[in-house]
Every structure is written in structure tokens, then in C-alpha cells.
């Protein structure tokens, strides 16, 4: 509604928007002052203009007196909105409804990069699983291409807290083994379709953390998103200085020879 749009801008300097996917409707507001801060727009000398193009918003910076375009600030799509919100830009996107329900991804494949960066491994060079997914899968929306729907999600493994009870245990943590262990943990629990090796014996591994003598440890997704496979669903929570333990995230718990997914039902799934 155009009247509501300009009313929200004039009163609260926010841009009210809506994303609809299938039967899920999500409304939110873009805080334009935060947007200006994020993209270094001096609101005393410039103003923000925006234009809609299908499902895209084009933000521009204009000179106040002449109204001349200085630059295109950002071309924002629903994917970008979800990604930024997922990575913690809470002050930029406010009053977001049904976010967890909307920010769901069907997970096809899990992999790690040991000798090169993930972008080079997946995009720059031909990657067997990525090519198979593009060849075999169908789109959810008949009006889009599969390349428009595929998302590459990159995660950094961050060890948060290690409590040493027995001083005879070496408290150093090998990062390569940690990454390898995390990959196997998620594959064994989520059973993603294009991972041929399922690691059914996990946590027993030769290159993971099994032999590091930990009493127990766990993995959580530190982002506000949900990963879905044919077998199960796992939901994350935003990691921040105010939410160090990702309280609302599901947990992959490893103790001894056992591994299980502990679901947190406090949030929307």
C-alpha cells in the first residue's frame, strides 16, 4: 500500500515491506537510519531513494539540492534480506515476523575445504556434487531457474568453550580435526542426499575428535536459519556477545560413542 509506505517513512523513517513464499507471509521494516549508517550515507548532504523492480529494491543516494544520483547504494533481494538478518543485522531489519519459518533451506550436500578456500572449491573449479545437484534437482517455483534457488552457505567453525577437568588431558585443539569432526557430525545426523559417505560409525573417526579424550562436546548453528533434509531438521540461533550459548538453537550432542540431535522447541520452526 503506497499510503502506508510513505506514512511509515515520514513517521518512523522505516520502509515497511513484505515477503511471501508459498503460504508463509513475513512482514518487516528496514530502519533507514541504520541503512544510512551501514552504507556511509550522510543524511545531512544526501537522501536515500528507492525503486522497486519485481522482487528487487534498488537503493540510490541522491544529492539533496540537485536531486542528482550520486551512486547506487545497494540492490536488495529477498535472499539478501534473509542472509543479512540471519547474520545478525537486527537493528537494520526490525519487527520481522515469521523469520525462522521463512529462512529454511533444503540441504543437499555438506562438505569442507582442507587445502583451498571454499569458494574456489565450489565455484571457481568444477565441483562434482554441485554439478550433480544442478543436473538432477527441480525448482520449487516453476517460474524460476534452479540457479536462482540454489544457495551456497559458508560456515566458520568456532570453538567456544572447553572445560578441562583432568589436567592430564592436552587442552590444545587441532582446528583441522575440529572441522573434519564437525562435517561428519552434521552428515551423520542430517543424512544429506548428495553425501555418499554417511559416517554411520560417528563419532568414531580417525581424523576427528574421538581420540582427544573429551567427556562430551556439541555443535550448534550460530545463525538464524533452519536446514531441512528428508530425515530431519536443525535450527540455529544468532551467536553474539549477548547470546554466547545460542540458547534457542538445536544441539548435536556427542558423549562417548553416542551422538544425538537435541531439539529446542522454544522457538518457531
Language model features with spans:
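Boundary/linker segments flanking structured domains
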Residues: 1-269
Amino acid at each position: 500500500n503506497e499510503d502506508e509506505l510513505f506514512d511509515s517513512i515520514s513517521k518512523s523513517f522505516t520502509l515497511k515491506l513484505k515477503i511471501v513464499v508459498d503460504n508463509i507471509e513475513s512482514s518487516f521494516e528496514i530502519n533507514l537510519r541504520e541503512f544510512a549508517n551501514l552504507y556511509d550515507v550522510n543524511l545531512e548532504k544526501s537522501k536515500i531513494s528507492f525503486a522497486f523492480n519485481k522482487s528487487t529494491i534498488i537503493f540510490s543516494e541522491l544529492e539533496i539540492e540537485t536531486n542528482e544520483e550520486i551512486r547506487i547504494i545497494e540492490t536488495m533481494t529477498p535472499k539478501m534480506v534473509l542472509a543479512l538478518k540471519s547474520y545478525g543485522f537486527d537493528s537494520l531489519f526490525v519487527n520481522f515476523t515469521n523469520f525462522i519459518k521463512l529462512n529454511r533451506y533444503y540441504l543437499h550436500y555438506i562438505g569442507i575445504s582442507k587445502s583451498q578456500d571454499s569458494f574456489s572449491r565450489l565455484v571457481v573449479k568444477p565441483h562434482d556434487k554441485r554439478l550433480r545437484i544442478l543436473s538432477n534437482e527441480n525448482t520449487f517455483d516453476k517460474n524460476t531457474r534452479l540457479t536462482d534457488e540454489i544457495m551456497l552457505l559458508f560456515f566458520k567453525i568456532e570453538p567456544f568453550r572447553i572445560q578441562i577437568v583432568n589436567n592430564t588431558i592436552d587442552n590444545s585443539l587441532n582446528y583441522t580435526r575440529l572441522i573434519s569432526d564437525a562435517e561428519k557430525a552434521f552428515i551423520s545426523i542430517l543424512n544429506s542426499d548428495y553425501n555418499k559417505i554417511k559416517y554411520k560409525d560417528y563419532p568414531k573417526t580417525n581424523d576427528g575428535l574421538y581420540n582427544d579424550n573429551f567427556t562430551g562436546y556439541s555443535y550448534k548453528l550460530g545463525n538464524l536459519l533452519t536446514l531441512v533434509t528428508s530425515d530431519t531438521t536443525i535450527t540455529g540461533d544468532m551467536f553474539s556477545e549477548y547470546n554466547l550459548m545460542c540458547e534457542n538453537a538445536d544441539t548435536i550432542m556427542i558423549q562417548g560413542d553416542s551422538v544425538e540431535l537435541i531439539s529446542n522447541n522454544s522457538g518457531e520452526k
